[in-house]
Regions:
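Extended catalytic cores of very large enzyme megasubunits
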Residues: 1-345
Length: 345
């Protein structure tokens, strides 16, 4: 598998490296980086041998881009990046282009779509209305589908949306069918204030069930052939969800805010939203929940003056600032256990 996925290949596409060649290429390339920090050639050689031994003994392996690109002209060794998106067509397309180049080099990408105006919102330049963040996510997904990461694997993305965005429920159900956003993990960014509101809004709810009919209506829409007809059916189900979750009593609900105008569009019962999202995650695997305030505490974001964390890498374990990259690796704990000859374990 290693030779097939990570080896350099000839013009016929056949591997020209054995596993040990891959490990030496990576070890030497990574170790030579220390020449920039005062290490001698002798020290670098020793470091390369140590790194090779870790990989050869299967105690540690770096991420795929490192295995594929180290020692080559590309030199893109990072696993994942977070790219910012602003509310303009220029920014949306520029970020899409950057995403494609990162995927081409073997990296994954994470995005927050929270700054994009909601579906149906006004576009001054054309006098029309926007399709909203979910539709742009599908465009990103389609581009991803055409590019293998480093020519090795399918691209991967994380798409996040703030829970205060007017398209929050439309976003929550976007992966109910098997064909939408197949190259995305999706997560809602929830705040401490929202979680408090979940507890407070529970008293307004007498029935914990979610509108199964609306959820099933959205799921079944994938069988409709025509794109326009399918989208109309999805919107019917989404509208039912908004009607169900809308806050109708005094003191109930939290505000959805249009990011373009900063105006309130409606109020939803936070307990119902939370209940729906957790039910969908349990039953279908998406969306996830990201506790965005926790990620911006000093222990998680040590450089708050640089910016606020709004997204993570595709798998969600690494919060990143805009244009940040993460370099991942796998430690084989079983190989690192020190066996006690006096123990039966």
């Amino acid at each position: 598998i290693a030779e097939t996925r990570y080896s350099q290949k000839n013009e016929e596409g056949k591997p020209v490296e054995k596993v040990k060649d891959i490990f030496w290429r990576v070890a030497i390339n990574v170790a030579r980086g220390d020449l920039n920090f005062g290490k001698t050639e002798t020290e670098v050689e020793r470091l390369a041998k140590d790194f090779y031994q870790l990989m050869a003994e299967q105690k540690f392996l770096p991420n795929t881009p490192c295995l594929v690109n180290a020692g080559r002209s590309r030199q893109q060794l990072s696993a994942c990046f977070v790219l910012p998106i602003e509310d303009s067509m220029e920014s949306i397309l520029e970020t899409m282009s950057n995403m494609a180049m990162i995927h081409k080099s073997g990296g994954g990408t994470g995005f927050s779509f929270s700054s994009l105006r909601p579906s149906g919102d006004y576009i001054k330049s054309s006098g029309g209305t926007t399709v909203g963040p979910v539709s742009f996510m599908q465009a990103y997904n389609d581009v991803t589908a055409q590019i293998k990461q480093g020519g090795v694997r399918r691209g991967a993305n994380m798409g996040m949306l703030n829970v205060y965005h007017p398209d929050v429920l439309r976003f929550a159900v976007v992966k109910l069918d098997e064909w939408s956003l197949t190259n995305f993990n999706i997560s809602l960014a929830v705040t401490n204030e929202f979680m408090k509101r979940v507890d407070e809004d529970k008293k307004f709810v007498t029935d914990d069930s979610i509108p199964e009919e609306a959820v099933e209506e959205i799921r079944q829409a994938e069988a409709i052939r025509g794109v326009d007809d399918r989208l109309r059916e999805v919107e019917k189900g989404v509208k039912k969800l908004y009607d169900w979750a809308e806050a109708k009593q005094v003191g109930e609900g939290y505000e959805l805010i249009n990011p373009r105008t900063n105006q309130v569009t409606m109020k939803l019962n936070a307990y119902k939203v939370f209940n729906l999202v957790t039910r969908l995650a349990w039953q279908f695997g998406d969306p996830g929940l990201v506790f965005i305030d926790r990620m911006n505490e000093p222990s998680s974001n040590p450089v708050p003056a640089v910016g606020r964390i709004e997204a993570t890498n595709p798998c969600g374990e690494q919060p990143l600032l805009p244009y940040d990259a993460c370099n991942l690796g796998s430690v084989n704990l079983a190989k690192l256990v020190i066996k006690n000859p006096l123990s039966s374990v």
